Amino acid sequence: ESGGGLVQPGGSMKLSCVASGFTFSNYWMNWVRQSPEKGLEWVAEIRLKSGYATHYAESVKGRFTISRDDSKSSVYLQMNNLRAEDTGIYYCTRPGVPDYWGQGTTLTVSS
């Protein structure tokens, strides 16, 4: 993953994840985050090319947008109107057996 860092409340950040080791276009992808306060929390999901359906956690709905580029084996998370409670380590993940986890990127939202 890339794109983490320090952002002020109300700011924006875009995370990127380039996946490897599997046929990216065949799998749903997720973003999850981990924080000391909330533990591991699912953030967003994007499904396959037939519509690229998306689903979001209530806490990020209307603020975060997940997208993907199958030609680049990449999944993205555009995050707007960031809040302190969005602070955490963000991972791209692929459900399945075995599952896939990116290395994670840290986002800190603080003034």
From Swiss-Prot:
Coiled-coil stretches: none
Ig-like domain sequence ranges: 1-110
A Pfam family this chain is assigned to: V-set
Keyword annotations from UniProtKB, A to Z: Adaptive immunity, Immunity, Immunoglobulin
GO molecular function terms listed in the Swiss-Prot or TrEMBL record: antigen binding
Cellular component aspect of the GO annotation: extracellular region; immunoglobulin complex
GO biological-process terms attached to the record: immunoglobulin mediated immune response
CDD domains in the cross-refs: IgV_H
Matches recorded under PANTHER family: IMMUNOGLOBULIN HEAVY CHAIN
Miscellaneous comment: The sequence of the first 197 residues of the C region was also determined and differs in only 3 positions from the corresponding portion of the mouse MOPC 104e mu chain.
Official protein name in the record: Ig heavy chain V-III region HPC76
Taxonomic source organism: Mus musculus
